[in-house]
Amino acid sequence: MRDLKYVFSKSIKDTALALKKNGLAFILLCGLVSFLSSLASVFFASGLIANLGYIINYFIQILLLSVLAKIMNNMVVANRIPNRDFKYYLEHYFINIMNTFFVIYIIELIYQFASYYIIYGVSKLDLTKSRILSVTLLFIIEEMILGSWFEAVYIDDIGGLAAIKRALNFIKENFIPWTLISVPYLLLKTLSGGYLNGFLSVPMWARVLTSILMPVFMLLRGKAYLLLSRSTKRKRKFMMEYEN
């Protein structure tokens, strides 16, 4: 319990310090990235260019995630907004994120194939219950088991299968603290649309509120990941004694 309390308190303290220095600029930049992402999805996924637009939107989303990765790296590691070498890091993160997306896509294909026969076939549940179960399991796989892949990309500087392996090892070693500290972010992400599409209509005010709060909890996750991935329980025990 002492270790868990220390992880929470230090992560929150480090997050507050980063927000105190560059909080407004950070939230505005993250909001801009989110807005551009939504705008691109709406524009390129409709009308006559829908088929070609799907491909264009895919690369735009990766580019925007690359921008977000650079912003998050600077805020998590150095408590500052990026202002140099932006082009290099965009290209760097773009490749890592694209490779990771490809691996996740393969995992989703395998999951869809398995869930079709197991959930929709063997379980004999009705269509609604089968769909809810399928979405819930996909949420657990993508957001909890593999949920730290983005932090692995922008903090550990890896991508593709290496990022997925890192996420698996990380959750195995830090399941309880990472799950607990990720709960607010996952709730906000769920409320913003995502996995609830088709099940629940989320009002516009809630979407706006989540767009403001999500960057804060993304930063909290990043700070927690940095602490947990760079230390063991023994090291954190020493840090507690030293700081006290």
Which role does the model predict for each range below?
Residues 1-244:
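Hydrophobic alpha-helical membrane segments
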